[in-house]
Amino acid sequence: YNLIASAFGHHIYESRWLRDQKYLDQYIHVWFRGNGGQPMKKLATFSSWAADAILNRYKVNGNKEYMLDMLPDLESEYKRWESTHRLSSGLFWQGDVQDGMEESISGGRKKKYARPTINSYMFGNAKALSQMALLAGKKDEAALYEHKADTIKNLVENKLWSVKHGFFETYRTDSLANVREAIGYIPWYFNLPDANKYDLAWKQVTDEGGFLAPYGLTTAERRHPLFRMAGCCKCEWDGAIWPFATAQTMTAMANFMNNYKQTVLNDSTYFHLMELYV
């Protein structure tokens, strides 16, 4: 079907505003049931925050019946990721290409590193599954997924936060990657970080040595010696500006501004960055 798995969650977030929801109904069903009643194979490879997105779609259209019909599919997907991508630390690993973010500074196509992406997605999915379970009257399952979310949150804050750089980073085999990348903002996409402890990270969006560039926000900090040094491919995430990354970062920024008491950013900053990009 020429589907793109890496942005599946983003597609749901965007399409939930369509007046005619039959297209998104079918799109979700194709991904989860379009392979002879089973999920499409790419869904088992590329990172996804489908459960979170489907819950947020429900908050727009109010179709609880459709959402709860998808609950078994979403639970199966979550358990599969737990069985295939969880490290001994409890964090989840992913290759950068399977995040849709290949040739990054911090990762690699076959590197099993704990990235802010997959761990934030799994947190968001666990929180969503907990809320869905409550709506389905399954209190024990709701408590289980809430516990899973809390565990991931603590691991992200304690293992992926760089005190040195004031940023969420990728954790390699035995240390942080020592580079700020736009994926370090994804925890706020799901309101994961505690308030007032990690606000410092957002100073980098207004710093020209950080992510601020003439045409928007870069995918890696501009001061890093490996910024835009890959030089190998058409899709490079070592600093190039991408719509996918910009959408994630700006959503995370909106959450940070709307849901946290903070003094780092204001409305003018947000709209200036949006104007630069568009």
Indicate where each model-derived feature is located.
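Active-site neighborhood of glycoside hydrolase catalytic domains
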Residues: 116-159
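Surface-exposed helix-capping loop/turn segments at secondary-structure junctions
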Residues: 87-88, 131-140, 160-166, 260-261
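Acidic/polar-rich alpha-helix caps and helix-coil junctions
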Residues: 139-140, 144, 169-172, 262-268, ...
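Extended, well-ordered alpha-helical segments in internal regulatory regions
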Residues: 128-130, 187, 192-195, 249-257
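Extended glycan-interaction surfaces of carbohydrate-active proteins
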Residues: 1-2, 18-41, 83-114, 154-241
